[in-house]
């Protein structure tokens, strides 16, 4: 029986799953939006949100806990210097999942997962000259 077993297996063994979510969490913190399948996005939310909650209180112990989970110093610095102060007044729910259709190759449902309150940079308008 499968009672009280939380989390999705995603057809991977445990070390592959841990490495995949470590990489996806790093990418999400670095770029603040990534595109992935819906089940992976829902599981990634369970990995990233506790890290952001940890980053709201800056201490050496919390930085070491975050480094133990992500293993990337640049990401830990961004978590504690940018994302922690950004979400200090929010009590959870730091990510948003936007479904965006299905993948062409295997018809898998695809979604964007993004951090809330991210700054969207406007592309500069290009001026075309007839030269």
UniProtKB/Swiss-Prot annotation:
What are the UniProt keywords, alphabetically?
Answer: Ribonucleoprotein, Ribosomal protein
**Which GO MF term does the entry hold, naming one?**
structural constituent of ribosome
Superkingdom of source: Bacteria
Instruction: List the Gene3D superfamilies.
Output: Ribosomal protein L17
- A GO-annotated cellular component: cytosolic large ribosomal subunit
Q: Which GO terms describe its biological process?
A: translation
Q: Does the keyword Transmembrane apply?
A: no
NCBIfam families recorded? L17
PANTHER family to which the protein is assigned, alphabetical? LARGE RIBOSOMAL SUBUNIT PROTEIN BL17M, RIBOSOMAL PROTEIN L17
What is the annotated quaternary arrangement, including any partners?
Answer: Part of the 50S ribosomal subunit. Contacts protein L32.
Q: Which family does it belong to?
A: Belongs to the bacterial ribosomal protein bL17 family.
Q: What is this protein called?
A: Large ribosomal subunit protein bL17
């Amino acid at each position: 029986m499968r009672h009280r077993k939380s989390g999705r297996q995603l057809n991977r063994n445990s070390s592959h799953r841990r490495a995949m979510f470590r990489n996806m969490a790093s990418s999400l913190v670095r770029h603040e939006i990534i595109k992935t399948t819906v089940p992976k996005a829902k599981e990634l939310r369970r990995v990233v949100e506790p890290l952001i909650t940890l980053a709201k209180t800056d201490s050496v112990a919390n930085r070491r806990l975050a480094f133990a989970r992500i293993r990337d110093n640049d990401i830990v610095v961004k978590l504690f210097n940018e994302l922690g102060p950004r979400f200090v007044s929010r009590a959870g729910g730091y990510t948003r999942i936007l479904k965006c259709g299905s993948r062409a190759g295997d018809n898998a449902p695809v979604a964007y997962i993004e951090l809330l309150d991210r700054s969207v940079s406007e592309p500069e308008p290009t001026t075309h000259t007839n030269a």
